[in-house]
């Protein structure tokens, strides 16, 4: 397999109804570079793992599946679910070989077939910045009605400093692409840090 330029890291837990749409939206991306899709399941009780394995079998050069350790039928309070999500994202992050990384939740999908190409082009053009990321507007989508609604106020096209970003702007985690800090020997996941839909 060619060295991937972008690694898409996807976490799943009991999301079998969404697996196909999520992965199809990623694999339908139109890029002039290779990608890798790393999927982790956190002990789903439905057939999420079986569906993921089917995609891995169809696209062995692109899709890899990791099944996390779990106790069958284990009840997970919210704080445990967040810690597990951190562990999953950390595991996938350590496996990622791409120059750039995107996170995607297992029940979300890309709507723009050029999302990865557009964001990679922006990051490629900004070679002087070590810790650059870029994001875009996101929306809620209701399958039952086909209606959408912006997650937050629309983002205008602009460049922001870290201070500006953290002071007022929310960009959904799934809308971000950022440089693979691990390739720079930096670990952004400090143990014990609570992460809940934050930048990292």
Description of each model-found segment:
Residues 105-109:
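The conserved acidic donor/metal-binding loop of glycosyltransferases
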Residues 4-7, 36, 199:
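Cell-envelope/extracellular polymer assembly enzymes that use nucleotide-activated donors
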Residues 114-149:
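Conserved donor NDP-sugar-binding/catalytic core segment of glycosyltransferases
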Residues 85-86, 94, 155-200:
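Conserved nucleotide-sugar donor-binding catalytic segment
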Residues 25-77:
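Acidic donor-binding segment of Leloir-type glycosyltransferases
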Residues 15-28:
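Short, well-formed alpha-helical segments that are part of the catalytic scaffolds
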Residues 101:
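Short aromatic/hydrophobic "clamp" motif used to bind/position activated sugar donors
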Residues 70-96:
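Glycine-rich, basic loop-to-helix element that forms the pyrophosphate-binding segment
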């Amino acid at each position: 397999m060619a060295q991937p330029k972008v690694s898409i890291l996807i976490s799943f837990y009991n999301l079998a109804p969404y697996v196909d749409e999520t992965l199809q939206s990623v694999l339908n991306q139109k890029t002039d570079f290779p990608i890798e899709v790393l999927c982790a399941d956190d002990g789903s009780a439905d057939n999420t793992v079986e569906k993921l394995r089917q995609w891995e079998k169809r696209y062995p050069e692109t899709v890899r599946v990791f099944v996390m350790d779990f106790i069958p039928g284990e009840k997970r309070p919210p704080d445990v679910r967040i810690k597990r999500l951190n562990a999953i994202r950390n595991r996938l992050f350590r496996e990622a070989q791409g120059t750039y990384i995107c996170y995607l939740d297992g029940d979300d999908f890309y709507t723009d077939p050029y999302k990865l190409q557009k964001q990679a082009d922006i990051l490629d053009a900004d070679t002087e910045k070590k810790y650059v990321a870029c994001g875009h507007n996101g929306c809620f989508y209701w399958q039952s009605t086909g209606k959408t609604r912006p997650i937050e106020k629309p983002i205008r096209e602009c460049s922001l400093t870290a201070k500006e970003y953290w002071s007022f702007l929310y960009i959904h985690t799934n809308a971000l692409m950022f440089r693979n800090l691990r390739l720079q020997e930096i670990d952004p996941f400090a143990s014990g840090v609570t992460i809940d839909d934050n930048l990292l």
